[in-house]
């Protein structure tokens, strides 16, 4: 049996993996656990009562976290004319059309989010094999294909997270950094849960919000007592 590291031993002494913690206590414990050598993200996994094999039960969306993610986000925008100018004024890092497409084809993907005006999708669509596997393909369901490119840029810069259920019906996303105050993390988590409730598929039967767990990038997961969330 592998020997536990000092960090693993310290973590085991602080948490009970079988326990469900009130949300504020769970987030507070994450801040107290021995950390890695970098500022870890706080991540959440939400098990939803959906059948991910059915296309009408895939949950996909985006949430603007009230306290941001703690990350600097670079945004690329495919737009022209007035929309391009609006994107630049909103703080987009890269704005273009065919020239930006050539950058992408050349392997220059120095951005975290891609936004596209509807009339740019003819150009963007051809980049699907490059952007798609990297999770960068714009999509109207998460607000990244929109006439309001300026609004999309501002949302991305403000800390918008995008998510989609995986094959197990689970949503994964980061809700901040471990050095955030507990209240800020709790507000971010609650914003996500509130939006997920709004996205409940009409055909979802039984319990929708089944389990919520929080963790740091390199740390263990803590189950959250659902009664401590506003659902």
Swiss-Prot record:
Q: Which UniProt keywords apply?
A: Repressor, Ribonucleoprotein, Ribosomal protein, RNA-binding, rRNA-binding, Translation regulation, tRNA-binding
Q: Which PROSITE patterns match?
A: RIBOSOMAL_L1
Can you list the GO cellular component terms from the UniProt entry? cytosolic large ribosomal subunit
One GO molecular-function annotation for this sequence?
A: tRNA binding
Looking up CDD domains in the UniProt record yields: Ribosomal_L1 (cd00403)
Q: Name one Pfam family in it.
A: Ribosomal_L1
State any GO BP term from the record. Answer: translation
Q: What does this protein do?
A: Binds directly to 23S rRNA. The L1 stalk is quite mobile in the ribosome, and is involved in E site tRNA release. Protein L1 is also a translational repressor protein, it controls the translation of the L11 operon by binding to its mRNA.
Fill in the subunit field for this protein.
Answer: Part of the 50S ribosomal subunit.
HAMAP family xrefs: Ribosomal_uL1_B (MF_01318_B)
- Identify its protein family: Belongs to the universal ribosomal protein uL1 family.
Q: Which PANTHER family is this protein grouped with?
A: 54S RIBOSOMAL PROTEIN L1, MITOCHONDRIAL, LARGE RIBOSOMAL SUBUNIT PROTEIN UL1M
Protein name per its UniProtKB record? Large ribosomal subunit protein uL1
* Source organism per UniProt: Alkalilimnicola ehrlichii (strain ATCC BAA-1101 / DSM 17681 / MLHE-1)
């Amino acid at each position: 049996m592998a020997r536990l590291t000092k960090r693993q031993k310290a973590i085991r002494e602080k948490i009970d993996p079988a326990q469900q913690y009130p949300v504020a206590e769970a987030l507070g414990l994450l801040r107290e656990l021995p950390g890695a050598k970098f500022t870890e993200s706080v991540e959440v996994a939400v098990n939803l009562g959906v059948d991910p094999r059915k296309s009408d039960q895939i949950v996909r969306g985006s949430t603007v976290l009230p306290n941001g993610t703690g990350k600097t986000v670079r945004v690329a925008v495919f737009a022209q004319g007035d929309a391009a100018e609006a994107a630049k004024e909103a703080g987009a890092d890269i704005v273009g059309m065919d020239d930006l497409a050539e950058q992408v084809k050349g392997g220059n993907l120095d951005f975290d989010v891609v936004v596209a005006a509807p009339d740019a999708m003819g150009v963007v669509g051809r980049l699907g094999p490059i952007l798609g596997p990297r999770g960068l393909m714009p999509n109207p369901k998460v607000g990244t294909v929109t006439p309001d490119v300026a609004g999309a840029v501002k949302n991305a810069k403000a800390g918008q997270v995008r998510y989609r259920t995986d094959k197990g019906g689970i949503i994964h996303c980061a809700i901040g950094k471990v050095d955030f105050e507990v209240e800020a993390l709790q507000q971010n988590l609650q914003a996500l849960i509130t939006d997920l409730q709004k996205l409940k598929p009409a055909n979802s039967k039984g319990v929708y919000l089944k389990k919520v767990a929080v963790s740091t990038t390199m740390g263990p997961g803590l189950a959250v007592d659902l009664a401590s969330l506003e659902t």
